[in-house]
């Protein structure tokens, strides 16, 4: 279901040097976003920090939104790798999905500036970034499916449920960043959604 990072998000680098360059760009982006949020990520500074020409940066990522959405994909991929290191705790799919989404939420809340930059980019994305945004949403849905199915192939119903829950998860992050709900309320809402959608 998910689009592998580096394919739909941008053209897959073909050489070791290109892969290293792309990694430096993403790391520079994450550092700037963590320091000052969305506004702190300026393409020229990203190019300088990652030691690439500005034109090269734009060939990889046509805009700041493309860049930050790709950085979001990178963070979700890191999360997926961490979750695969051991069995996800929980005797039911509700418990396992709750664990995954709680970990995901807490991971974002530890760095509000970075979260603001990544989620704001998702909100600002227009039709030119549609494939990238879809890829990120699919990654989040796949994390949920991973918890639901424990390695088994998902059903169409599983994919529909995961889509609903990732929509709720993203919506609650947006509300939190906008100051409309507290961090505690985020989790209350997500837990309620899990209970309603996944009735074991």
Model-derived features: where do they sit?
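Amphipathic C-terminal alpha-helical segment
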Residues: 106-110, 146, 165-184, 195-200
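Hydrophobic alpha-helical connector segments
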Residues: 70, 84-110, 161-165, 187
